[in-house]
Design a protein with these regions (language model features):
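Short helix-to-coil transition segments within interhelical loops
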Residues: 85-91, 95-115, 155
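Loop-to-transmembrane-helix entry motif
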Residues: 3-11, 38, 42-48, 88, ...
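Membrane-helix interface segments
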Residues: 27-35, 61-64, 103, 158
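Membrane-spanning helices that line or support transport/gating and their immediate boundary helices
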Residues: 19, 23, 30-37, 80, ...
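Transmembrane alpha-helices
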Residues: 67, 71, 104-136, 160-164, ...
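Transmembrane alpha-helix signature in integral membrane proteins
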Residues: 1-24
């Protein structure tokens, strides 16, 4: 329960920010010019390489764990959202404008549906990545969670509990993937590639 809460909160913070900046940079050339190259530079730094800095900044409390997970899931969602927005057919947007659609209607009816397959790929990738990051984050002086349980069991050479921890991470990852696929099928039910 503690691990799932950390994963969900990290996904909401990092994923929400990634979605917002992906939409912003994908839609605005000025925002893209100002922000995208900086974000791409930061993306090349592995999230796990930030651990010493995160401990210096946030200590070893929940904020450090949340930050690591959020940074890790930010980039898959950001990149896929940015790419999805940029790859929407410009002719469809022009056609929408010629029909008198407002900017909000263009987003709702053309841009977001066109970018949705790419956005959901980013979400699915992030849902897999969140558990990897959480394993590492929970080894940073956690007092609860699967990572804490596993590290504690390692200290006492309890192989069975370590294996249970690994199995729990695998099951949570599988559950997250099933939820992502279900969400894909629901949100893309109009898309020919997702129809039964």
């Amino acid at each position: 329960q503690v691990s799932a809460g950390r994963a969900l909160l990290g996904l909401l913070v990092g994923g929400g920010l990634g979605l917002f900046l992906g939409l912003l940079n994908g839609s605005s050339k000025m925002a893209s010019t100002l922000l995208d190259t900086t974000l791409q530079m930061i993306r090349n730094i592995p999230a796990l390489a930030l651990i010493p800095l995160v401990i210096l900044w946030f200590g070893i409390d929940e904020t450090a764990k949340l930050f690591l997970v959020a940074v890790g899931v930010f980039f898959p969602i950001y990149i896929n959202t940015y790419h999805g927005i940029r790859s929407v057919d410009p002719q469809l947007i022009e056609m929408g404008k010629s029909y008198g659609l407002t900017r909000w209607q263009l987003y709702k009816e053309i841009i977001l549906p066109g970018a949705m397959p790419s956005i959901l790929v980013g979400l699915r990738f992030s849902l897999g990545l969140v558990w990897v990051l959480l394993i590492v984050a929970e080894t940073i002086s956690a007092q609860a969670g699967i990572g804490y349980m596993t590290m504690n069991a390692r200290e006492f050479l309890q192989t069975d509990i370590v294996l249970v921890g690994i199995l729990l991470y695998a099951l949570l990852g599988k559950l997250a993937d099933v939820l992502a696929v279900t969400l894909e099928k629901y949100l893309l039910r109009w898309h020919a590639g997702y129809q039964k």
